Amino acid sequence: MTNPDNMKPVEATDVESAAEKTSEPTPASGTSTITQRWKREDLIKKASPITRGICLLFSLIAFLIMVSNKHGYGRNFNDYEEYRYVLAISIISTLYTAWQTFAHFSKREIFDRRTSILVDFSGDQIVAYLLISAASSAIPLTNIFREGQDNIFTDSAASAISMAIFAFIALALSALFSGYKLSTHSFI
C-alpha cells in the first residue's frame, strides 16, 4: 500500500487507544446542558423587558427634549419637518415600549402565546427602524445648522437625536431577544 503523505501507517493499537480515550456522555453532562438552556432562557426573559424599559426611557427623553426645543423665530422644532419626524417617532416608540413593558409586568395575556411572540418581534423591528430613520433624517439638518452657529437650539436637537439613537440600540437588542424567542419557540 502506498502512502502519499509519507506518514507512518496507522496501527491497530493506535486506534484502540484512541477509542479508549473517548468517553460516552454521562447523564450529568445532559443535565448540565438542560440547566444551561434554562439559564439562557431565564436571561432572555429578564433582558427583554429591561431593554424595552431602557428604550422607553430614551424615547421619553428624546420626546421631552424635542418638545421643549422652542427658542424663538427660526429656532423652533415645529418649523422643521425633520424634527417633527423625530418627535412623532419618539411618541410612537414611547407608546409602544410603554405598552410592551406594561404587558410584561402585568403578566396578562393580551394575545395568545404565538401571536404575542410575533407581535413582539415585528413591533421591535418596525419601531427600531423608525427610530433610526428619524434620527438619520434629522442629523444632516442639525449639521447644517451647526456650520452656521452653535447654539442651544442645535444642542437640544442633537441631544434629542442622540437619545433616539440610544433608544434604537436598546430596541435593536430587544429585537434580537424577540427573534431568539421566536426561533426557539415550538408552535406545536
Swiss-Prot record:
Region (Disordered): 1-34
UniProt keyword list: Cell membrane, Membrane, Transmembrane, Transmembrane helix
Residues passing through the membrane, by range: 47-67, 85-105, 125-145, 157-177
Pfam families registered for this protein in UniProt: CASP_dom
Subcellular location: Cell membrane
Subcellular location, principal: membrane
Membrane topology reported for the UniProt record: Multi-pass membrane protein
Comp. bias regions, Polar residues: 24-34
Residue spans, topological domain Extracellular: 68-84, 146-156
Cytoplasmic side: 1-46, 106-124, 178-188
Highest taxon of source: Eukaryota
GO cellular component: plasma membrane
Assembly with partners or alone: Homodimer and heterodimers.
Family: Belongs to the Casparian strip membrane proteins (CASP) family.
PANTHER family found in the cross-reference section: CASP-LIKE PROTEIN 4A4, CASP-LIKE PROTEIN 4B1
Name this protein carries in UniProt: CASP-like protein 4B1
Organism: Arabidopsis thaliana (Mouse-ear cress)
